[in-house]
Amino acid sequence: MPIEITLERRQLPLTSTEAALAKGATSRHALRRQFDRAIAAKQALFEPAGALKVDEATLRWSIHRYSEQLVPDAMGQIKFFLSLQRPFYFEPGFAPLFYFTHKSGVQGFSVSKSAVSAVSEGVGAVILQRVMAARILHRPINDFPDLIGTAAASGSQITTSKLYLMEVKGTCMRSVAEMQQTLAEEVFRLAAFTAAAQDLEPARAMVGVLVGVVIHTVDRFSALLIEVTL
């Protein structure tokens, strides 16, 4: 089954002053407020960037290969949760835990956050390879960011090519506007990390990529990308 991922992108170039604010704000809250004001003043909006068609088998492999979540059949768990969002009724006599009606206005269960994270990380890996045209070098475990990729076309160019530092956030059945707010709160951390990485490797370009994945249905996702450049 093909999955359609609608893309929106936002470019966020940082000046040297803004990069310094991001690094300093990791330990000084006053600088964090200055950084937030500087970013808000840029008025950069998300722009439509087309859509990706990804086969479910490809996404499942990407989840298995690049997610740090120990979740058996993450896609299956998402599908099960979404199936209960339709008008669906169990036979009388079942325990209340298994009785659900979307009309009641009360949701007594929630989707597995680990499954959402796993699927989102798999989507992030697909985007890094197919949208950014990068090769994945490393998947840090229990560390930041989620994925590191290179724009190198061959092995001989790895030491000088552009590096992509990708962090992925995910949610299920929430609005795109809510994800935009989440990314606005998270972009500071990625900006600080990207600026610090650039100081350590001044000879190559660093690009921080913050991805927000929204799972609407089993075959329709949205992905918001903020690209931090220096």
Feature map (PLM): residue ranges:
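Conserved catalytic cores of phosphodiester-cleaving nucleases, focusing on short active-site segments
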Residues: 147-149, 156-174
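Acidic-basic catalytic patches of nuclease active cores, encompassing PD-(D/E)XK
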Residues: 101-141, 195-203
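Short beta-turn/strand-loop junction motif enriched in small, turn-promoting residues
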Residues: 133-134, 152-155
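Conserved alpha/beta core surface patches that mediate binding of polyanionic ligands
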Residues: 140-152
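N-terminal alpha-helical "arm" segments
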Residues: 1-46
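Interdomain/boundary linker segments immediately adjacent to catalytic/signaling cores
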Residues: 41-118
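Eukaryote-skewed repeat-based solenoidal scaffolds used as protein-protein interaction platforms
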Residues: 129, 146-149, 167, 181-184
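Catalytic cores of nucleic-acid endonucleases
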Residues: 170-230
